[in-house]
Amino acid sequence: KTLIINFNTKTKKWDAEVKNEQSWEKDFSDLESTFIPAKEILSNSFNLISANEKSNVEFDDTYIDIIHSAKVDISAGRDALSKKPQLNRLEKIIEGKVYFDNKKDKFYMKYGSSKVEFNLVAEGIRKIALLWQLMKNGTLEKGSVLFWDEPEANINPLHIPLIVDMLLELQQGGVQIFISTHDYILSKYFDIKTSEKGMVEFHSLYKTDNG
């Protein structure tokens, strides 16, 4: 199915010209998709959803959606055997696990018996912790789609190879992944790993005389 959208810098919100929208929605309405913004948001999630619903603040829906996805309750669940090695590798980097306090409406990093508020943790660690959370709670399962804007932003370059491995393993497990990046190193790691762990397509977007 092809979805055609025409817009420019003067197009107002929701006023873009769209073709084949109805058939697109019909075919993909049941598809589970997740968008991870370049800016980490869980550290600022306290009462954000309720405030947004009451129009006290205005946030892009993608931020609200990722908070909803991260809040999925996993307390009663157990790690699937296939996920365990991946989760363990991520836990070694973040040195703990993600914990959501439903009563306080806050995310924490849990280190053994102690916990630290999410906003006190380095942003790069928080981004990796979010990936751990989405894998743990079943958001990223076979048949789902992940969109991630600049996954390398604020992450220690030493951890980039592991992030690439994680994403390629998710792809092998049936998760379709779209990444936007300006980082050559991240792209090169995908290029190197592609022959080993799956197929990756690269698309370069650039300006022309026509826009």
Regions found by a protein language model. Name each.
Residues 1-143, 211:
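Phosphate-coordinating catalytic segments in nucleotide- and nucleic-acid-processing enzymes
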Residues 108-211:
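Switch/communication elements of ASCE P-loop NTPase nucleotide-binding domains
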